Every structure is written in structure tokens, then in C-alpha cells.
Amino acid sequence: MVDKRSSPLGEVTPFLTQKTKLKVYKDVGNWQVIVGELHAKKRLGGELRYSIEELNPYLNREERNPYILNTALLEGREIKDDPHPTGAMNQLGKLEDGNVAELFFSIRTLRSPEEVLKLLSNYDVKATSMAVFAGELKDFKLGTYSSSGADYMIPHLTLRPKVQFGDNHSLSLWHTFFSEDTEITDHVKQLIADVEWMTDNIKYNGVDEDIKRLAYLRKNGVQVYGATVTGPVRELEKLKEEQEFWEFRLGRIEVWNWD
């Protein structure tokens, strides 16, 4: 996630190119851990271009899309594969109790965000984002994606907790996770509003695909096929009991920092 709490460091070059950079972080337990930096630039009358410089602590290990979109979801069928690959869960089982971690998982059927939060409500974990299905490979083709058998890893919209700014562009409301005190519709409305604003006001690579995503969401509503959660490692282990969750992948691990 991009840190929106601080003012970005911006500059305008002699050639009228706007440049800025922002910290990128992940929620691991109750900490926001810096994992990189976003660099964005826009030439006068040109496209907005950006790149993310990752602070990867490991050699020869690239970050990859952690969510699986199975062909069955595109065809309206239920995934019949083994829902619980053991890799991430085996790793969690070897961690000491005094740790928190970030865990990704995919979902066997398309679900509303409310349904996912209800499934998670029995566990002491926090959901920080969800992978949104917006018609990719079903209603329209994508320029780039990867696949392995019936599984697709695609660029996707991400549902995140709502962020709100005041009249002076200062941050007035900020959540790091989806709270039961806030209606999920508020977060969904922000997602739609953000995509509307971007496609109307910014030229960027992929804008045509986002216009199609927006049309799909307006017609069909928001459904998700994956989520990211964080919490104590013992609580994360319990998620393997949920039949709807599969393809678990372990993210960052930190020492205990949980309320």
C-alpha cells in the first residue's frame, strides 16, 4: 500500500515533467512495514508513468501475484482442486507463538466482501485488502497475465480500506484494515470513485482495461476472489479449516505487535 498520510515529495523539472515519490508499506500485525518506494512522473500533456522500487530482503526471490483466478470461477463453477496446499501452513507451523505475519489466500467461489469478512469474523485476524474480479478474461481480454494450467495470475483492482481527504487535501480518515464499525459499502464506493476519477482524468498504461473493469463493476457489483490478512501466526494457521479458502501464501513475518 502507498503511504497517503504524508505529503509526497514533488518536483517539476526544467522540461515541465512532474515527479514525486511515496513510501510503499505492508500491514504486518499492527505495524506498517516499509517495503519499497513508488516513483511517479508525468510529462506535460503525456501519460502518468510509475514504477515501484522494492526493498526485497532476499536474493533471487521476486514478488509475484499471490492470488489465483481459476478457470472454474470464470465459468461459474466451483473449484474442485485440493483447497489446502500445505506449503504456507507448514511454514506457519514452524514459527514460534510470539510472531505475527501476513497471509494471502484465494477463494474457491466469487464472494462479496461482506461474505469474506463474515468468514473471517471467527478469527483474531484483520483483513487489509481483497482482490476484485472485474470481468477479466471473461468479458474482455488482458494485455498481460500469466497462467499455469487452469490457474491465472492477472492484474486486478484491489479493494482497500477507505481513505478520505479534507478540503485542504489533508488526510481526514484513514484505516489500515476493514473494521466491523464501518460499512463495507463505504470502501466499495471509494474504489469505484477512485477508478472513475483515474479513467476520467489521467492518461496511463492500462486505462482502457480499467474502463472495461469499471463498466463490469457498475453492472455486476463488486465480488472478490482473494484476500490479504494479518494477525498472530497461530490464528492464521486456523484459516486452513475454512473450506472456501485455498492457495495460501505466506508474506512478511514480524515479532509480536498485536493488541
Which residues does each predicted region cover?
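Intrinsic-disorder-associated interaction segments
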Residues: 5, 48, 181-184
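Residue-identity detector for threonine
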Residues: 13, 17-20, 71, 86, ...
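Extracytoplasmic beta-rich ectodomain segments of secreted or membrane-anchored proteins
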Residues: 25-26, 31-168
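Extracytoplasmic/luminal low-complexity segments enriched in Pro/Gly and acidic/polar residues
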Residues: 172-259
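Terminal interaction modules at protein C-ends
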Residues: 2-20, 24
